[in-house]
Amino acid sequence: MKGGRTAKTHYTVHCAPDWTPSSRIPVSEEIIARYKDDLTRDEDLDLFKLAKRGEAAARFVGDDACDFVVPCFYKEKAGEVAHFGFGQYYRIPYIYTIGDGGHLPRAMKEASAVVDYADAIFGRKELWGSRLVFEDAVLKESKGVEAAHYSKTLGEPKPTSYQLYLEQEGEKADRDWGSENAPIRGYKLYWHQAANFPWRKDEAEFKDNVDRKIRPLKAGNVFKGRIRFKNLSEVELGALLKVFSLSAEDRELCFKIGQGKGIGLGSIRIDAKLVLVDEMHGYEELFAADGGWNKAEREASMDEYLKAFDDIIAQLGKTERARYDLSQQALLDLLDWKAVEQKDWAARTRQMTLGSDKNPDEAFDKEVKQFRNRWVLPTAHEVYSEGKGK
């Protein structure tokens, strides 16, 4: 029965419970497991930690046979409890897991039977290790760090934001994790932002339990490091080098690493060169001609290995090649540093907000309330091409 100022205010009528065995509704182990699988629930709201057990439960119910009881809300379906929860924090679990609902491409579901280049090079923890070793990158040219300041809130991914993670049909977010065969959109990446992007948060707005101070590196710091590899085939080495050899006309590609990628931090340019080691020569001579250690290293061209990988790509079927080209196009759009020079770039790639109910203009502004209204994200190419040439 609705009442009060808003539809969120309700009156409830409570009746004495019927504890007789004939009135009980079974709860399956699967439903209980779904409830326990909620990893983001506050521990203080966990029904299983609030329950009465043993003698306390028997006294509460008035039945010596009862050893567990906890008041809760529930939904009955086909004579069984379909889901249960706690007051305003009631959560209805999705009926599918990510793998069972058709959200993953078949190739990923059958990944255990397929070894791709990522598996072959980086390893698969259950079966074999990586053939790469990432060394620490050492600071070579320092520009210092920014003064410590509270950053804009850096939240974790929220599964309930299905409009961001699942492909939607049209402009409305009608497909969620309970929708069968609603595919995941792809890999999550963040747009680059100009060096003056406002990552700081007003100190009057920070929350102790959410926000903290950070000290980002200033632009222009230079680091040097190595990625060591061993026993890679020409094609595998070409696949690895492809990451550092992405190129396109009129583009300057940068990558994203570290914390704060969503608030404009973490953009880096990588200048790579290939150095090969002749191990046999290294064993033959201890010292080099200049008297130093014989490292048996020589700088080599990447072209031979890149061509070996490109030749494999050229053998893809029409559908697979179209999918590969589409992913490469999206990647180039997302990594292009020159995009920050486009007109209205910061406005077109800004963080979505909930809007402020305290501000009448914001409370009804669909643009400001994009996140609350479950605005469906455009594709990377749509965002990039909108400002092309501006």
Each model region followed by its residue ranges:
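Basic, Gly/Ser/Thr-rich N-terminal segments that form RNA-phosphate-binding interfaces in CRISPR RAMP
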Residues: 1-390
